[in-house]
């Protein structure tokens, strides 16, 4: 198995107290940290009222963009996405706060949900979830939950976004095809959970962490898988699929997060599994695993995103403590 080695470019100490990393992004392709190469991180203030904040990381430091109290929706999470050198935050299914230039004042772009009241794309009971989404264009896959609300995602849709015309609309609302996975549960109608989504070269990827409704931190997952899917949720190809994880009696599970690169980040739930709690990467093209070696003194950091040779890491210890921008030194 190959190994990806990281070296530290810059470490950021946080002046304010934040909860944890909701999702991340990158604003430009770049092999080194330079003017215009910036990383994004969606988090939330610990102190009341707990405002959501986008941290923009560059060689000059951290720019904090606090989202308004109207983003504190009890039902819907904000969703971060990037497009070239700009980014947007989807608010409550209805509009996009679109940040350009110096990000000081966002444009508000409404999202159309069908053209007639009786033909809405998103059902009323759909709830927006923050899980990391990556796209190389203007079609942004977004995670949702409906009917039963655990803060998870079992549904998705596509946001069709036109940054030139300042228009956006929802396209479709689907679940991932359950029966396509070897270890699906016939006893329930629960659709596979969605950890992360990616649209690249007109191909839609989804990572599912199985179907279990119970606490995976307590009981483990039933299975996990990576697949190419259609916008209607049909599984076109499985790139990765685990065994039935509960068959051996040992708790197990792996979460997946797409990046702005060919790699999917795989994060095990438990430290006593076969991976010893260490993250791995999975190449979407080569379909091979890669180990990750963090820079010295940063072994407790977790990897959250990759773009070119840039890697975004963060340290969580009862709150978000530290953020790192690293460079890929090489692959051995």
Question: At which residue positions do the language-model features occur?
Answer:
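Repeated scaffold domains used in trafficking and secretory/extracellular systems
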Residues: 17-32, 71-84, 114-137, 182, ...
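Structural motif
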Residues: 47-54, 94-100, 149-159, 213-227, ...
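Beta-propeller fold detector
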Residues: 7-12, 63-69, 107-115, 169-177, ...
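Short beta-strand elements that form the blades of beta-propeller/WD-repeat-like
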Residues: 31-44, 79-91, 97, 117, ...
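A short helix->beta-strand "capping" segment at the edge of beta-propeller domains
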Residues: 1-22
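Blade-level signature of beta-propeller repeat domains, shared across WD40, Kelch, NHL, RCC1
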Residues: 301-332
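Acidic, serine/threonine- and glycine-rich low-complexity intrinsically disordered segments
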Residues: 123-133, 137, 141-145, 151-162, ...
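Short loop/turn segments that connect beta-strands within beta-propeller blades
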Residues: 57-60, 101-104, 162-165, 230-232, ...
């Amino acid at each position: 198995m190959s190994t990806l080695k990281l070296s530290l470019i810059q470490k950021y100490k946080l002046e304010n107290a934040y909860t944890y990393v909701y999702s991340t992004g990158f604003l430009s392709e770049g092999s080194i940290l330079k003017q215009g190469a910036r990383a994004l991180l969606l988090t939330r203030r610990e102190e009341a009222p707990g405002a959501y904040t986008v941290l923009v990381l560059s060689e000059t430091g951290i720019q904090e963009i606090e989202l308004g109290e109207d983003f504190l929706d009890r039902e819907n999470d904000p969703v971060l996405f990037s497009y070239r050198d700009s980014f947007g935050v989807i608010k409550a299914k209805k509009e996009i706060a679109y940040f350009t230039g110096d990000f000081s004042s966002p444009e508000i772009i409404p999202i159309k949900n069908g053209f007639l009241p009786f033909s809405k794309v998103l059902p009323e009971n759909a709830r927006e979830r923050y899980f990391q989404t990556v796209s190389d264009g203007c079609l942004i896959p977004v995670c949702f939950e409906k009917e039963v609300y655990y803060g998870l995602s079992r549904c998705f849709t596509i946001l069709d976004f036109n940054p030139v015309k300042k228009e956006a609309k929802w396209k479709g609302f689907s679940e991932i095809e359950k029966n396509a996975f070897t270890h699906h549960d016939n006893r329930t109608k629960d659709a596979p959970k969605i950890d992360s989504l990616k649209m690249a070269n007109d191909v839609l990827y989804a990572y599912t962490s199985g179907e279990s409704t119970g606490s995976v931190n307590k009981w483990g997952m039933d299975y996990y898988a990576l697949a190419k899917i259609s916008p209607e949720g049909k599984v076109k190809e499985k790139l990765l699929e685990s065994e039935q994880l509960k068959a051996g009696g040992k708790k197990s599970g792996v979460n997946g997060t797409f990046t702005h690169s060919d790699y999917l980040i795989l994060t095990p739930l438990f430290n006593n599994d076969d991976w010893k709690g260490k993250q791995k990467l999975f190449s979407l093209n080569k379909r091979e695993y890669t180990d990750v070696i963090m820079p010295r003194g940063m072994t407790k950091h977790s990897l959250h995103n990759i773009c070119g040779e840039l890697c975004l890491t963060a340290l969580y210890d009862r709150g978000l403590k530290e953020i790192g921008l690293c460079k890929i030194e090489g692959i051995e």
